[in-house]
A protein has these predicted regions:
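Catalytic core of soluble alpha/beta enzymes
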Residues: 170-216, 221-229
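Active-site-proximal loop/helix of nucleotide/amide-processing enzymes and allied scaffolds
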Residues: 100, 117-119, 125-127
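Hydrophobic faces of well-ordered beta-strands that scaffold small-molecule active sites
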Residues: 54-56, 89, 116-119, 139-141, ...
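Conserved N-terminal beta1-alpha1 strand-loop-helix module at the mouth
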Residues: 1-105, 110-114, 157, 163-182, ...
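Conserved anion-binding
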Residues: 123-195
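Conserved small/polar residues in nucleotide/adenosyl-binding loops
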Residues: 230-239
Length: 239
């Protein structure tokens, strides 16, 4: 069993516990309290100004690195990101492997104005309405974690309740599957979720297979200005 499979198995256990605490009806009522912030448009606005559109990540830990930040204050991190020009925030909500918490979404939303992405392993429709109920504007669908029928059903449900969707791929086969649902936003993850190895070349290799009308996000491995510049130049040369 690889890392992704272990995470999915544990995620399913977490979902059962969540369902016991809050019903779908409860979540639907909670979801009505938020006005959507436009996640995709926030990114596109920066791109239209020829600026880097950064989705800044709020993450305490990961399976590959362990604890990343001992003194972890998600609100302080979020407000710092916003002050320094982030377009959007990506909030890890997986608890067993990333030490996240879904409550971070609501806490952070109250302190910032920019849109929020719930970054988690979505494998059940319950998580989709849960995402909206806790204040996220966008959710992540990982093609490697879903079959093609789940991908379409989850995408359709999320968009029907006015959530933006970031569809994540890791290779050409997954990209071809993603394109069958006509997403507006595709993320190429430079991290292999089976091994957790990172190569930014992954984005450069796959980018030309994505239609120009689709907003492209490069994920993972961008940790300094030089790498960011390389990705910006690669993006500009898309056919």
């Amino acid at each position: 069993m690889n890392i992704l499979e272990k995470i999915i198995e544990e995620t399913k256990n977490t979902i059962q516990k969540s369902k016991a605490k809050k019903s779908l009806h409860n979540l639907e009522e909670l979801s009505e309290q938020y006005t959507k912030r436009e996640f995709i448009k926030s990114i596109q606005n920066k791109i239209s100004l020829n600026q880097s559109a950064i989705i800044a990540e709020i993450k305490k830990a990961s399976p590959s690195k362990g604890i990343i930040r001992d003194e972890f204050n998600p609100i302080e991190i979020a407000t710092d990101y916003e002050k320094n020009g982030a377009s959007c925030l990506s909030v890890l909500t997986d608890k067993p492997f990333f030490k996240g918490d879904i409550d971070y979404l609501d806490l952070i939303r109250k302190e910032v104005e920019i849109p929020l992405l719930r970054k988690d392993f979505i494998v059940d429709e319950y998580q989709i309405i849960e995402t909206k109920a806790f204040g996220a504007d966008c959710l992540l669908l990982i093609v490697a974690a879903l079959d093609k029928f789940q991908l379409k059903d989850f995408f359709d449900y999320a968009t029907s309740i006015n959530l933006d969707v970031l569809v994540e791929v890791h290779n050409l086969d997954e990209l071809e599957t993603a394109l069958t649902i006509s997403p507006n936003l595709i993320g190429i993850n430079n991290r292999n979720l089976s091994t957790f190895e990172v190569s930014i070349q992954n984005s450069i290799d796959l980018k030309d297979n994505i239609p120009e009308k689709v907003t492209l996000i490069s994920e993972s491995g961008i940790n300094n200005a030089s790498v960011s510049y390389t990705h910006l130049r690669a993006h500009e040369t898309r056919e």
